[in-house]
């Protein structure tokens, strides 16, 4: 999905850092709300549910570099833009599937 690799960092930098949303609101808009729209039982942490978690470093600024994207989609208008909120680890069903 084009833009997925930059969506959290851009959302954090442009919305949370600038006071438009709280971090909790951003997380809800990127997890709970899409799960509701898709009708899937995901988007929250609870006993007995799949542990699908993204861990991001919201303190460190980094430069978006599309040549380092994991996905095949390398097209982005944000190549070279600085942002905060680099995803460090992604866990799906309790298993680490991505580690920076």
Residue ranges and their predicted role:
Residues 50-99:
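C-terminal cap of metal-dependent C-N hydrolases
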């Amino acid at each position: 999905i084009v833009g997925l690799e930059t969506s959290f960092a851009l959302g954090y930098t442009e919305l949370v850092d600038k006071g438009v949303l709280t971090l909790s609101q951003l997380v809800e808009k990127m997890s709970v709300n899409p799960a509701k729209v898709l009708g899937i039982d995901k988007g929250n942490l609870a006993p007995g549910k799949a542990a699908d978690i993204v861990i991001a470093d919201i303190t460190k600024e980094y430069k978006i570099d599309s040549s380092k994207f994991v996905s095949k989609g390398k097209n982005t208008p944000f190549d070279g833009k600085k942002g905060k909120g680099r995803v460090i680890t992604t866990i799906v069903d309790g298993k680490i599937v991505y580690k920076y």
